């Protein structure tokens, strides 16, 4: 593995869309006691369903701590590769490398800086050194050269690419005080163009209400095809999410992509508000002496937090009447893939969902 100090755009590399073919997927075995209630037992069951579904059509690598290796190996399908690598938590989307390709059979990774979604300003845990090493270590594991961009804080969940020159981000996240406060919006956009290999960045104002990542784009909006997106939506104007989704809709309707196309927006309904119970809170350890959740707190539940595998779309379900409607919409948008709904409340309690715990490895 070489550590590169050029940029992907300079070298003819770009971030492909998630709906492009994959070689595989990266996930991390959940363990952290202040993220995953009651010893992560229920979370692991949900992770296993995600792993089993994705690994039917692409290779799967799972990282785990040395202490969890035997337990994880006993539960994971034999086809899944299990690797000991220390992490601070299980958010593969945000700590794993962002992979870029050149269309000529080469793939490289990007090692962004990671500071637990806000560092000393509003980060979610006090120490993130292990997480900040994952991207580079994983690139070494798969023998891919890596671009060093640790001086720029960026998580995989905060960026989407259509593979044809357009990126999708939120202002709430990318311009947050805890990430790159010394850079202007224009400078941040240039970094995205240089490293994602895009020529157009569509900025959505906001994400999902109460999303503690400062409103990652992957929870509110995602490309389903070039020039097409799904947008998390509610018709309830009294819900605080309505104004956030409406602002994003306005931005999308005013935008064109890198190829000059208007964006076709498919509204994906939200479930009714999901809140955490006192019993669930009691199952979480304190973080730095403070509780990580309070009973009744609204969680950032959204069907947009799905993963596009080679032969499946793996979406979260919440035991809500909207589960079936969201699944039907996604099935219409992805006719060549099977849309699989997985009960994901136990992932949501940790702070994210299915897209947040997965990271695709594009095929070359």
What are these regions (language model features)?
Residues 1-364:
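Histidine/cysteine-enriched polar flanking segments
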């Amino acid at each position: 593995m070489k550590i590169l100090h050029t940029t992907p755009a300079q070298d003819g590399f770009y971030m492909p869309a998630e709906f492009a073919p994959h070689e595989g997927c990266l996930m991390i075995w959940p363990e952290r006691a202040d993220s995953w209630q009651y010893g992560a037992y229920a979370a692991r069951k949900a992770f296993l369903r995600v792993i089993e579904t994705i690994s039917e059509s692409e290779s799967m690598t799972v990282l785990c701590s040395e202490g969890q290796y035997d337990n994880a190996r006993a539960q994971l399908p034999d086809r899944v590769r299990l690797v000991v690598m220390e992490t601070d938590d299980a958010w593969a989307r945000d700590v794993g490398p962002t992979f870029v390709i050149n269309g000529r059979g080469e793939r490289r990774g990007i090692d962004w800086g990671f500071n637990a979604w806000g560092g000393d300003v509003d980060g979610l845990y006090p120490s993130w050194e292990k997480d900040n090493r994952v991207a580079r270590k994983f690139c070494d594991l798969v023998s891919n050269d890596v671009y060093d961009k640790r001086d720029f804080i960026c998580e995989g969940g905060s960026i989407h690419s259509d593979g044809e020159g357009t990126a999708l981000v939120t202002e709430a996240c990318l311009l947050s005080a805890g990430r790159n406060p010394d850079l202007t919006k224009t400078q941040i956009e240039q970094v995205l163009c240089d490293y994602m290999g895009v020529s157009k960045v569509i900025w959505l104002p906001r994400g999902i209400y109460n999303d503690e990542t400062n409103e990652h784009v992957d929870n509110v909006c995602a490309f389903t095809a070039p020039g097409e997106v799904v947008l998390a939506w509610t018709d309830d104007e009294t819900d605080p999410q309505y104004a956030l989704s409406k602002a994003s809709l306005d931005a999308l309707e005013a935008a064109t992509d890198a190829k000059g196309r208007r964006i076709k927006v498919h509204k994906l309904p939200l479930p009714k508000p999901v809140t955490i119970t006192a019993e669930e809170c009691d199952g979480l350890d304190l973080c730095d002496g403070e509780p990580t959740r309070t009973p009744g707190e609204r969680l950032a539940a959204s069907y947009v937090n799905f993963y596009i595998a080679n032969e499946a779309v793996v979406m979260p379900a919440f035991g809500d009447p909207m589960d079936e409607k969201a699944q039907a919409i996604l099935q219409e948008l992805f006719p060549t893939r099977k849309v699989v709904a997985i009960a994901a409340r136990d992932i949501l309690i940790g702070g994210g969902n299915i897209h947040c715990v997965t990271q695709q490895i594009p095929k070359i």
